[in-house]
Amino acid sequence: MIHHAAPDFWSSYRSLPSEIQSVADRAFALLKADSRPPSLHFKKVDNFWSVRVGIHHRALGIDIMGGVLWFWIGTHAEYDRLIG
């Protein structure tokens, strides 16, 4: 599975504190190396793909041909509002 990041993802990413950006970098490196690492809770939530970025953050993506397009990353509270 190939992972791509949309411009909106990078906008959300840049608004995160640098320590969370580092956690996100490690999470996505792990995701690219292992398509379903248990620690990331990579799963389908309705029409979205969800991945854990540390304890308090999540990222959302959508299916595209051959992979996932990640469009958002932020706090778990924001995530709950988006998928709620």
Model-found features: residue ranges?
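Short alpha-helical scaffold segments that flank and stabilize functional sites
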Residues: 8, 27-30, 64
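Residues in soluble alpha-helical coiled-coils and helical-bundle/repeat scaffolds
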Residues: 15-18, 36
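A short alpha-helix capping/helix-coil boundary motif
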Residues: 5-6, 38
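A short, surface-exposed loop/turn module that caps and links secondary-structure elements
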Residues: 27-53
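Enriched for short, Lys/Arg-rich terminal
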Residues: 2-4, 11, 15, 22, ...
